Amino acid sequence: MLCVALAVAMLVSCKSSKKTDAEQNAMSVAGPAFDADSAYAFCARQCEFGPRTMNSEAHDRCGEWIVAKFQQYGCTVQQQRADLKGYDGTTLKSNNIIASYKPELTTRILLCAHWDSRPWADNDPDSTNWRKPVMAANDGASGVAVMLEIARLLQKADSLKVGVDFVCFDAEDWGIPQWSDATDNGDSWALGAQYWSQNPHKPGYEARFGILLDMVGGAGARFYQEGFSKEYAQPIVNKVWTAARVAGYESLFPNDQGGYITDDHDPVNKNTGIPTIDIIAFYPNCQQSSFGPTWHTVSDTMDNIDKATLKAVGQTVIQVLFSEK
């Protein structure tokens, strides 16, 4: 992902998106308890394969594991394979993984995350690490881990009134590295999401709304309201931040403006019309990066994954899903 705009507005409370009393009163605590220990284990298992960089054995083996886990939890799984071109002309063997809970239901919610790893730790404070791959415990594995735990809970509860499509986007993090002389206009990122949004797994695919989970396991993370999410899907931002408040995680979901992030939700919004938001960590006071101290560094490992963060995000999404009628 790429942060394309950072401004004073990020730190100013967004008065227009404050929830009304009616919105808050309309939502009560709902859904099963999200198991952060289970999500943490899913995150660790992905990392055990090694960095899931494009065209690598670790990538392919992890993909097989993700497919098997969603199938284990009763989802119907499709794999959308495509040869995509990286910024440098490299052919990327991409595999978007789509797991559908209750595919027979016409009313659907889209949950998504990317599952590939950044091939270069180009934001590492040590320049000798810039061409090393990133383990991507947070920036990759955490979002998939939360989705897998939700899939496990849905199979167990089996009481959700809507269908859910879990989409694991590939080739998100092959964007132009900072050490390259190439001009970065954002098009080199989110390649799998770009492809899926133009070639959905089901012709004419529709969903009530979508939620992208990106970097949702980092220690000290907070989730501000991302700019493009507010632009394309303000009602969904309101819904999710209300759910966070009801679930007891208002402190991690402040009612403040974040940056404008080029991420997987961007092509989904532009090409499908499905109002989709990005739950993405924002660290306004971090000198290393507003995405946090481990972003695109060799330190993005399980040592820096916080179960409390996974719990807050996972329980918030559960609250959203089980509040849908």
PLM regions: where:
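A non-catalytic alpha/beta surface segment that caps or lines the substrate-entry region
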Residues: 44-104
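N-terminal capping segment at the start of a domain
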Residues: 16-62, 73, 287-304
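Acidic/histidine-rich catalytic neighborhood of metal-dependent amide-processing enzymes
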Residues: 131-235, 260, 264
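Extracytoplasmic/secreted proteins, especially bacterial periplasmic and envelope-associated proteins
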Residues: 38-45, 61, 65-72, 142-149, ...
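Second-shell loop/turn segments in exported
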Residues: 25-33, 48-57, 84-87, 129-141, ...
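Active-site-adjacent substrate-binding region
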Residues: 81, 91, 209, 216-325
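C-terminal motif of bacterial Sec signal peptides marking the signal peptidase cleavage site
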Residues: 10-13
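Solvent-exposed loop/turn segments at secondary-structure junctions
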Residues: 52-54, 83-86, 103-105, 115-119, ...
